[in-house]
A protein has these predicted regions:
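Ser/Thr-rich, low-complexity intrinsically disordered terminal regions
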Residues: 1-6, 10, 16-195
């Protein structure tokens, strides 16, 4: 009886490292993922918390590996005003209990709204840094995201999964939210001058 229990416990202890080894063999050894490799969202406040030299996006070679491994990690275009996109994104970040270190809402004279936050990996609790950029477009708003492990050289797909999950939830949430319409000026009754 105790030998079988010991064997089961041993297998359970080896299961997670085995799973990571399997993931490592199938995924590229990268740990900085973004929806926009040509112009990735930048760490600003988080740059002070990251190891020296790790805040800049790693470049074209990593972008090629990312595109091959995670072709679905792409910007999200929403047909809602930037304020709705930003507020919904911030609500989802808070719901996930990520630690928000900076939140810059849309404002006159500011091109992008930005959220910077620290997320933790589910099992080991490692810190990963996240920056989300919301930009006004003619159609509504575009959301770009970057998720980077603070210390790891291989993220085992965690950052891509985090981006996918947030953007899918954002798309679903915005689709279920009524879009505020601009106020319309009331038309005067026929035969009366406009005020």
């Amino acid at each position: 009886g105790s030998a079988i229990l010991g064997l089961i416990l041993g297998l359970m202890l080896l299961a997670y490292p085995g799973y990571l080894a399997y993931r490592a063999s199938r995924l590229p050894a990268i740990s900085d993922i973004t929806t926009d490799p040509s112009n990735p969202p930048r760490f600003d406040v988080l740059a002070r918390l990251r190891p020296r030299g790790s805040s800049d996006y790693p470049g074209a070679a990593v972008a090629r590996q990312q595109t091959a491994a995670y072709p679905d990690v792409a910007p999200l275009q929403l047909n809602v005003p930037i304020k709705v996109a930003y507020d919904t994104t911030l609500a989802l970040v808070n719901k996930r209990k990520w630690h928000v270190v900076d939140a810059r809402p849309p404002a006159a004279g500011r091109r992008d709204a930005v959220i910077e936050a620290v997320a933790r990996t589910p099992i080991m609790g490692f810190r990963d840094d996240v920056v989300i950029r919301v930009t006004a477009t003619r159609e509504g708003a575009r959301v770009d995201m970057r998720s980077a492990s603070r210390y790891a050289w291989h993220d085992f797909g965690t950052n891509a999964s985090r981006i996918r999950s947030l953007l899918e939830d954002l798309d679903d949430s915005v689709g279920a939210t009524p879009v505020p319409r601009p106020e319309q000026k009331s038309q005067p009754p026929r035969g009366q001058p406009a005020k």
